[in-house]
């Protein structure tokens, strides 16, 4: 028999999932708490017990997305970049990545492709939240700057969160403005747009979802 704690967590998760669907389908502004409560099968008071308002629900969705995406990026950095530097197989100097052998370069390239696959799978799995985020960022409302929270994945007071670890490993490592701009506009934004428009593009173009994903991967790998 589920414990009270388990039931409480289950109810909270149901609220989050239903709210996510409403936000994605109707838009954040058009979504009403009483409609979320009706679909969940609870009264409004219970929703307010877990969340102060619908903004708090969206904040939770965005922060969870941010945290999970950060884990993927940090894991790749630790398992590949930092590991190769420590093993003497990679040296980063003046923005140039120097591998000690062609084999090392090839191994890193393959790891990078797997990382791209993981990132694409992640944004597609969370495309309903990303769709909300992208559309809300285009409005002149509270969440117009929400997408820029992801800049914190690129830098924190001028430094990338994982760049500190790289710098501690390789003192020649430097990060500049071009790196930040490239990662945001040619890294995150294409991924977010792909996820946000994935379903509608598949319907409009007649391309199957599997082929659409494969086509995007081929294009993304060239960037």
What is each model feature region?
Residues 1-10, 21, 81-85:
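N-terminal intrinsically disordered/low-complexity leader segments
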Residues 14, 18, 22-68, 79:
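Helix-turn-helix
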Residues 61-111:
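Amphipathic alpha-helical linker/stalk segments
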Residues 64, 132-136, 186, 190:
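Short acidic/histidine-centered micro-motifs embedded in hydrophobic/aromatic stretches
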Residues 64-68, 72-79, 122, 126, ...:
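Phosphate/oxyanion-binding loops and surfaces in catalytic or ligand/nucleic-acid-binding neighborhoods
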Residues 82, 86, 121, 125, ...:
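C-terminal peripheral helix-coil segments that are non-catalytic and often amphipathic
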Residues 104-107, 111, 115, 146, ...:
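Soluble or luminal CAZymes and related metallo-dependent hydrolases
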Residues 109-110, 114, 118-172, 181-182:
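Amphipathic alpha-helical packing segments from all-alpha helical-bundle domains
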